[in-house]
Regions:
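Amphipathic alpha-helical polymerization modules
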Residues: 1-223
Length: 223
C-alpha cells in the first residue's frame, strides 16, 4: 500500500471511529449518569484514536425517590460484580431480595454495612455519602475519583473497569435525584455533520486516487 493510500485509509478509519462515538452518545442521551465519549488522537502504531469520557456534570433531575442518588462533581460510585470492583456514575439504585443496595443491573453497591431493608421512609443519604436509617448508621457509600478518565473501560450495564490511580472524592450526593446524561444534542449534531462531510471528502479522494492509478496502469500498458 502506498503512503498516499495509507494516509487516506487512516483518515477514513478515524472518521468511522468518530461516527461510532457520536452514535453511542446519541443512543444514550436519556440514560441517567451517562458520560459522553470523545475520540481523541492516540499517537501509537496500535490505534489512531482512543476514547475518553467527558467528565462534565450532567443536569440534576429531581425524582423524590429515596434510592435515586445524583453525584455532583467528578467521581464514581464503587460497585461490585462477582467480586470485581467497578465504577458507575448512575445512582438509580434499588434494594434486592436480601435487602442489599444494588444497581439497576444488580451489581452490589459498596459501602453499606447493614441491609437497607424495604422500609425506606427513614432512609437518609447525606451529601458526603453517609447512609442512615433514622439515627442508625448504615455505613458510607464508597466514592472515588479517577486520575485518568481515558483509562476507563466499559464493563456493561453502565459500569466501567479502572486500573489507574484513584483519588479521594470531594463532590456531593443528592438524594431523590438522578444526574442526566451530559450530552449536548446540538453539539453532537454538529459533530455528526462535520465528520460525515469529512468522510465523504475522503471517499472522493479514494475515488480520484483509484482513477489516477487506473490511468497510469493503462498508459503503462499502451507503452
Amino acid at each position: 500500500m502506498t503512503d498516499t493510500l495509507q494516509a487516506i485509509a487512516r483518515a477514513l478509519s478515524t472518521d468511522v471511529q468518530t461516527l461510532g462515538t457520536i452514535s453511542h452518545n446519541v443512543a444514550n442521551m436519556n440514560t441517567p449518569g451517562y458520560r459522553g465519549v470523545r475520540a481523541v488522537p492516540e499517537f501509537s502504531q496500535q490505534a489512531l484514536l482512543r476514547t475518553s469520557l467527558d467528565q462534565t456534570d450532567g443536569s440534576v433531575m429531581q425524582t423524590a425517590r429515596k434510592l435515586d442518588l445524583a453525584l455532583q462533581g467528578p467521581g464514581f460510585f464503587v460497585v461490585e460484580r462477582e467480586g470485581e470492583p467497578l465504577l458507575v456514575r448512575s445512582g438509580a439504585f434499588r434494594v434486592d431480595a436480601q435487602g442489599q443496595l444494588v444497581t439497576a443491573n444488580g451489581d452490589l453497591v459498596r459501602g453499606p454495612n447493614a441491609p437497607i431493608g424495604t422500609d425506606l421512609d427513614a432512609l437518609r443519604v447525606d451529601a458526603d455519602g453517609a447512609l442512615w436509617n433514622g439515627t442508625q448508621s448504615l455505613g458510607q457509600l464508597e466514592l472515588i475519583t479517577v486520575a485518568d478518565a481515558g483509562a476507563l473501560r466499559p464493563a456493561g450495564g453502565g459500569a466501567y473497569r479502572y486500573e489507574g490511580e484513584q483519588g479521594p472524592w470531594s463532590g456531593q450526593v443528592i438524594q431523590g435525584a438522578l444526574e442526566a446524561a451530559n450530552i449536548d444534542a446540538a453539539g453532537e449534531t454538529i459533530r455528526l455533520m462535520e465528520t460525515t462531510r469529512h468522510a465523504e471528502s475522503v471517499q472522493r479522494a479514494i475515488s480520484i486516487y483509484d482513477k489516477a492509478m487506473d490511468t497510469g496502469i493503462n498508459r503503462l500498458g499502451d507503452n
